[in-house]
Amino acid sequence: MQSRQGEIPAVFLGESGAAPCDNRGMTTREILVTSALPYANGQIHLGHMLEHIQSDIWVRAMRMAGHTVHFVCADDAHGSAIMLRAEKEGITPEALIDGVWKRHTADLADFGVAYDHYSSTHTDANRELTARIWLALKAGGHTESRPVKQLYDPVKAMFLPDRYIKGECPKCHSKDQYGDGCEVCGTAYTPADLINPYSVVSGATPELKESTHFFVKLADFETMLKDWLAQRRDAGGLQAEVVNKLQEWFADGLRSWDVSRDAPYFGFEIPGEPGKFFYVWVDAPVGYLAAFKELCDSGRNGLKPDDLERFIRADSTAEMVHFIGKDIIYFHTLFWPAMLHGAGLRTPTAVNVHGFLTVNGAKMSKSRGTFIEARTYLNHLDPDYLRYFFATQLVPSLADVDLDMKAFEERVNSHLVGKWVNIASRCAGFVHKFFGGKLAAQLPADESAAYAAAAQKLSACAALYAARDYAAAMRLIVEVADEANAYVAANAPWTMAKDESKRDALHVVCTLALNYFRLLTIWLAPVVPATAARAFAFLDETPARFDAAMQPRLNVAIREFSALATRIDTKKIDAMIEASKESLQPNAPATVPPSPQPSPASGRGGKTDVAATSPAASTPSPTISIDDFAKLDLRVGKVLQCGFVEGSDKLLRFVLDAGELGQRQIFSGIRAAYQEPEKLIGRNVVFIANLAPRKMRFGVSEGMILSAGSGGNDLHLLDADAGAKAGMPVK
């Protein structure tokens, strides 16, 4: 275990630093910004990059607005999954996480994500801060211990987290369901409820054993958390959807949180409790502060070692802003603020939550080649292109972002190449050919007014960036780019260049056009930093602030223009998708479930990259007689309605036309696989018509829709031939 000081790739250090002092009366802010920690058990993929790009854009924009920002992240490096994977690969957990850290930092740096410090949760700084918070909670009477019964793997001699146990659902009897809930019918249960449970690690039948566990009494903080929620809501630090979800959890009651795991486990041992380790979700968020401590100790960004205490004390005026995905809301808005408050420390200023990434309208898929790792993308396409496309879709809500490959290609080619870069490419040559590479010394009144209007319009982008409404900012930028291109087209400098009497007018047209280009570049810089840097090199300047855009740049030399961006070739996208299929074939080293820790908000692993492979999955089920099969009344149903179920993260509600049987309402646990349920309307599906109706808190489910796959996002509805009619029996 060590500090990650001195190991950070240069790109993580080159864009950062404290903003200059502001002399214009603007209130400047000092902000610590974090992204959720990637789990050190797999590669970074484009789903991860959505968040890292979102937070990096925000940090860059806030710095260009004049604020001081410190930007940190780390690998989440603890847990049973890492311990078991290291064992399977024949290396130590430390060696495993070190190799993953190097790959993660390289991927992030190559995407232009400029962390001031990128650490690991397996550091001395994190151990010390985690112990400090735990001991403060304990001293305050907010912890307790009690015996719990858990399933134990007698072969591996270890207690099994819920996600390491599979078996038959006690309700719908679907096979190979995880120990915390059925992904087919949506029922929540404990591992002890499973029928014929087995260990995902060894395949052995688990035994029920008792162990002492440690808990944080979350109910102690209910009043504080409700007050914090109200304050953050009123200050814009929590989105409405998050507030609504928190209120649901409050209504259900806050239960004590089990924060311990038994040896063997890779993590931090609880002080004074040999053989007991902190659950990964205890030390993971503390990793934000540990990474910041290491940054303070380094002396970079104008920080000093004692600045950590200034930042984390309860009355700190600095801000702490987290960017996370919607699957880990529970941990960041209940456990984390409670832990901090209980330790006498400051709570988060804002928790900014984003939706999931889909590709071509569906969940990322290994078989379709749309489960794309960051490195695979980088091997084929420019990272600024993805940054821009994500920006055109990112809004302040929890809406999912779809990477539609056709739209991606068209938007990049049209907006970045056709609208932005095109302005400079059409005018720069004339400045060098006729005017010695120098812009005009002044602009006439009409042109000055036109520039001022464009600059004023784009100044609204500062507030849009701050509000994380990047999509609106990009629309405004494209609008001004269209106006600039219309100006160039209307004046046709290529025609003016043929008439020597129009040289002065040509100089004015090219100067205004290139200032439009500069204006757009300044406002695009947080989104496409590498391309913007090349554009600024061409313009021979490096503006650090948005307010540099308010005045045109005149009577200065520019450099020779060279291509700043090229159009995306469809073949490159196709090659990337093919490479994704190849890089994720079964012969790759995968193996144990990547995350045993389900999020209470969603019931799914908060750090999962690839679905677990059951060692018993290939074992055939016991044979049944034809009479047993004949008991099932399988029918074709036509989907009349399909939508999300409020209050459930797993279920979709179907209304089927079942022919002579009338209409059937069925709740199906396939939400993870179908994020756009409205697209299922009109489809034929196969369902069990004679399953006893089941009363759920959402309504009565009148059957079961059949699907193929291993569960979670790997589920695929069974189709019936187009000739099949609603209500027809399936033989």
Where are these regions (language model features)?
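Helix-rich, typically C-terminal accessory recognition domains appended to large enzymatic cores
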Residues: 407-443, 453-558, 688
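Short, glycine-/Ser/Thr-/acidic-enriched flexible segments
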Residues: 38-39, 177, 221, 264, ...
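Intrinsic disorder/low-complexity segments
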Residues: 1-25, 582-616
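Intrinsic disorder at enzyme termini
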Residues: 532-593, 607-628
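N-terminal, positively charged nucleic-acid-binding surface of large information/translation enzymes
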Residues: 23-228
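Hydrophobic, well-ordered secondary-structure elements that form the walls
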Residues: 361, 477, 513, 529-531, ...
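Structured secondary-structure scaffolds
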Residues: 27-73, 125-129, 172, 195-433, ...
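Phosphate-backbone binding interfaces of nucleic-acid-interacting proteins
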Residues: 607-731
